[in-house]
């Protein structure tokens, strides 16, 4: 590819990654099985990331791309391509593969930041979170005995399902962990699959609630992106086992797994559309933006939090700063 210019070379490698994700969708779903996470999944994605790290590093050394963390960019691109290759089952006009690749190149080079000046408050720091909105009574702690029992079962399910996987976990282990009788379990759930489906929806609610508590404190969509991503990684660090359950459940009940992401995407799209109208975000297709940003955030969370077997797992300040730089400004070198 040495005879091509940098944009053409970037097109070649992104088209290769997007096509690979699209043509190997079933294999990517198989990698969601929790039993395979340490043994196969890490090595598989690392082998892909190694190629893209090398490409990004080489282009940065030539002055063709900005020298951001190549590992972050590599996993971010994997996430962007993977989420845009999924069949989300939504109606309406769909973009062609070539159109999606063109948009990924545009996003990679130019970022999402719009033309409106971003006025950051005094004392603003890229790694800081505002105080979250307090929970109201409706969204706070469970108040009835039945609600408390159901939440205890969900809390136990997070631990047991996360440790053993959906297939190997059994109801007896979950009820013992929750401190309830098996008969009580069947008052609330028809089966283990019914529990897992309920747990996926419960987790989705918790995450959306957490993000809203922080994002509602912001006035600018770019600030909302920054705060939302920080809040997501904070949530993920507290609930690492969740991301071993949701992908695995896609193998059993794809509709619920897809619902999990579509529910998150629906609210996200509204905020990005408003940001576009205020010129805080560039005029890129909202559906593409949602899938790209969700994919990038998802895979970086996997790489730095879920796939790290230490209590200190997390996205470092420097990596997060480079994520924001990549999302907002892209990799195209700035003119002096």
What do the predicted segments below correspond to?
Residues 8-9, 15-39, 53-54, 86, ...:
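Amphipathic alpha-helical segments used for helix-helix packing
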Residues 31, 189, 196-203, 246:
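Alpha-helical DNA-contacting segments of helix-turn-helix folds
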Residues 4-8, 140-141, 162-176, 219-223, ...:
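DNA-binding recognition helix and immediately preceding turn/loop
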Residues 19, 50-61, 80, 90-155, ...:
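C-terminal peripheral helix-coil segments that are non-catalytic and often amphipathic
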Residues 152, 159-194, 198:
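Helix-turn-helix
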Residues 12, 19-20, 37-62, 71-75, ...:
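Amphipathic alpha-helical packing segments from all-alpha helical-bundle domains
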Residues 1, 52, 149-157, 174, ...:
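Generic hydrophobic, amphipathic alpha-helix propensity
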Residues 1-23, 77, 198, 212-238, ...:
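Hydrophobic alpha-helical connector segments
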């Amino acid at each position: 590819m040495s005879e091509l210019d940098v944009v053409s070379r970037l097109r070649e490698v992104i088209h290769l990654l997007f096509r690979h994700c699209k043509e190997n969708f079933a294999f990517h779903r198989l990698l969601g099985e929790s039993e395979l996470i340490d043994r196969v999944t890490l090595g598989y994605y690392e082998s892909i990331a190694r190629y893209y790290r090398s490409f990004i590093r080489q282009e940065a050394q030539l002055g063709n791309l900005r020298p951001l963390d190549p590992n972050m960019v590599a996993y971010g691109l994997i996430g962007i391509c993977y989420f845009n290759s999924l069949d989300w089952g939504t109606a309406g006009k769909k973009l062609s593969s070539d159109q999606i690749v063109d948009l990924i190149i545009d996003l990679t080079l130019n970022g999402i930041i719009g033309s409106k000046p971003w006025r950051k408050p005094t004392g603003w720091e890229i790694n800081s979170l505002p105080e979250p909105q307090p929970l109201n009574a409706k969204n706070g702690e469970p108040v009835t005995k039945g609600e408390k029992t159901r939440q205890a079962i969900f809390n136990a399910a997070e631990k047991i399902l996360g440790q053993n996987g959906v297939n190997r976990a059994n109801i007896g282990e979950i009820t013992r962990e929750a401190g309830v009788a098996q008969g009580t379990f069947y008052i609330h759930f028809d089966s283990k699959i019914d529990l897992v489906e309920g747990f996926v929806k419960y987790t989705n609610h918790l995450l959306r609630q957490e993000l809203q508590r922080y994002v509602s404190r912001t006035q600018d969509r770019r600030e909302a992106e920054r705060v939302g991503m920080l809040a997501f990684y904070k949530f993920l660090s507290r609930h690492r086992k969740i991301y071993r359950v949701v992908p695995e459940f896609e193998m059993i009940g794809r509709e619920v797994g897809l619902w999990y992401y579509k529910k998150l995407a629906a609210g996200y799209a509204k905020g990005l559309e408003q940001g576009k109208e205020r010129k805080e975000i560039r005029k890129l297709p909202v559906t593409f933006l949602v899938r790209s940003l969700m994919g990038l955030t998802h895979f970086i969370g996997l790489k730095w939090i879920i796939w790290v077997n230490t209590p200190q797992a997390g996205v470092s300040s420097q990596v997060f700063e480079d994520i924001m730089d990549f999302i907002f400004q892209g990799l195209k070198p700035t003119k002096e």
